[in-house]
């Protein structure tokens, strides 16, 4: 994944995703190139999904979901259309090699595999310092 310049952060992200604090699990959006988008998250000790200073699996899943939502939100924002709500249909073949600690900077790539009507199949890679989590 190539590091990109941040194009959206802070309160600007609320234009892309429906979540609000304390449920916000992205704090940077880097944009879209072809069928891949990038987002980021600074893991903080007070994160809703942190336990004993470690981001739990559910937090990683929610981060991926919001990263995918930010991609869709960005596309709709560029079209000047209302951002739609989305839902996770299922999670399959997910492998987590390690959980990130508070202080970690996550960099996530969302790649579109297939889109049929309003259903989107994605793959995701979440990294910390170029190490796949």
Task: Spell out what each predicted region is.
Residues 14, 27-30, 97, 111-113, ...:
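Conserved positions in beta-strands of structured domains
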């Amino acid at each position: 994944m190539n590091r990109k310049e941040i194009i959206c952060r802070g309160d600007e992200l609320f234009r892309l995703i429906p979540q609000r604090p304390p449920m916000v699990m992205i704090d940077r959006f880097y944009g879209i190139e072809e069928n891949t988008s990038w987002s980021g998250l600074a893991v903080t000790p007070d994160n809703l999904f942190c336990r004993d200073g470690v981001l739990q699996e559910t937090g990683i899943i929610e981060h991926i979901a919001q990263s995918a939502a930010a991609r869709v939100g960005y596309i709709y924002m560029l079209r000047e259309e209302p951002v739609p709500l989305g839902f996770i249909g299922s999670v399959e073949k997910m492998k987590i090699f390690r959980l990130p600690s508070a202080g970690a900077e996550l960099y996530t790539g969302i790649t579109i595999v297939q889109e049929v009507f309003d259903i989107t199949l994605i793959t995701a890679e979440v990294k910390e310092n170029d190490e796949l989590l």
